[in-house]
Amino acid sequence: MLFLLAFAFAGCFTERGDEGELLYGRHCASCHLENGEGLRGVIPPLVNSDYSEKNRDVLACLIRQGIQGSIIVNGKEYNQAMPGNQQLSEADLTNIINYLHKEFKSPKERVSFGQVREQVKNCP
């Protein structure tokens, strides 16, 4: 019963207006820029990112834990480390990912709080 209450309560704090935009601005925009285009040749774009789409099932983990090493985004190689943010809650991650979907079409589908919770639970 307590689990159900916690799950329902957490859902109250996702999808709050512009929360995803605020979180993106605070934690992501300094590198990926407000328009999601990244820094050409250094920081990958988030706009229509095939990498975000291919990694949709672990996107919450990537945001929380960061990325090390080389990645390919939209056919271009990037080798700039992305710091993670362990402080982001599951609700924060849900809001950020859904903001990426809404603004940058990446990933192509929205995520639910439950999907993000499962991703975080299974992070390597």
Residue locations for each model-derived region?
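Gly/Gly-Pro-rich "capping" loops immediately C-terminal to redox-active cysteine motifs
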Residues: 37-72, 79-87
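Residues at helix-coil transition
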Residues: 33, 64-68, 98-102
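C-terminal motif of bacterial Sec signal peptides marking the signal peptidase cleavage site
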Residues: 8-11
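Flexible coil segments in periplasmic/lumen-exposed cytochrome c-class electron-transfer proteins
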Residues: 72-124
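Phosphate-coordinating loops and pocket residues in cytosolic domains that bind phosphorylated ligands
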Residues: 25, 48, 118
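Sec-dependent signal peptide recognition
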Residues: 1-6
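Sequence/structural segment immediately N-terminal to covalent heme-attachment motifs in c-type
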Residues: 15-39, 54-61
